[in-house]
Amino acid sequence: MPKTIRNEYYKKLSYESLMQAHLESRKGKSTRKEIIQFNLKQEEYIMWLYEQLKNRTYRHSGYTSFYVTEPKLRRIEKSIYIDRIVHRWYVDNFMQEYFVKSFSYSSFACLKGKGMHNACLYVQEMMKHCKRIWNNYYVIKMDVAKYFQNIDKQILYEILCRKIKDKNLLWLTRKILYSNGVDKGLPIGNYTSQCFANIYLNELDQYMKHKLKLKYTCRYMDDVVALVNTKKEAIEKLNLIRSFLKEKLCLELNRKTQIFQSTQGVNFCGYKINAYRLKIRDKGKRKLKKKVKFLEKQVKQGKMTCIEAHKYLSGHLGYINVANTKNLENKLFATEI
């Protein structure tokens, strides 16, 4: 795989590749009004978009903002559908091909086959291994403060420029990167933002692996776990990581960052992880039970069928199955709704 991207923009740009990006973008959303309207003239719209990108006259539109409360209060910035096609085309043809494949094996989140469940199982395997070689050891649990809001775009652009040597692709990169009109922070909701955020903290992954020589690390977006032999080593490594994040990436760790003995278990991605046990955290259990009650109410009010409710619940089965929580599963799925 080439280390840099050269003269690839126009090679990848075609009516067919943009149409494919459209087909990928609309998956699971084909009943939405904006997509129904787009589909009515999709060939015309895709050809127009192709000409815009070919002539470098494409301009990113503004965003619609709204808030979500789960898992916490966050502001989501939604771009119009045709811009989302560009995001998909950009990520699938360049980011996935040239950046994602070079990520550390211990990096998870928004990567195919490397979701939350995989990250938790990976941490558990690390803990098993460290228990065998050290018996008792220490955990460095790190969480970046307001990660998406604090990403410095100039630093991110410089990181991207190391690999992107195609001036046309750099033009589009800047169009997307600065599309929300601010120099700091990525819009939560963009398909590109997840990838950019992973590229940004890949710098930390490489630093921990090559400079600090940390063998046992796992990162799920901005949540990081590192396992070390002694408390002294944990303190030293954490101080170095703090300095690196502040000096190189203009980021800080939040107050949830801590050092503790492995016997306490690790709270990570909604699970409580020990070397030989993996449980859903109490907070996660409460949310699941709350969802069951909500579905019961929806069915009783005639807003949802029993089949739809059970289908929705089944979507959480993977989350439950990863953990050793058979009793919880039986309680939830025995509910008559």
How would you label these PLM feature ranges?
Residues 79, 88, 235-236, 242, ...:
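Right-hand nucleic-acid polymerase module
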Residues 3-9, 93-149:
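Active-site-proximal segment of RNA-dependent polymerases
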Residues 28-36, 61-85, 102-115, 176-198:
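Short, conserved non-catalytic motifs in the polymerase core
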Residues 34-38, 60-67, 101-107, 135-142, ...:
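Short coil/turn segments at secondary-structure boundaries
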Residues 38-62:
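Amphipathic alpha-helical blocks
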Residues 45, 52-53, 121-221, 225-241, ...:
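Conserved polymerase palm-domain catalytic core
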Residues 1-47:
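Non-catalytic, polymerase-adjacent accessory regions of viral genome-replication enzymes
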Residues 85, 90-94:
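Active/ligand-binding-proximal structured segments within catalytic/core domains
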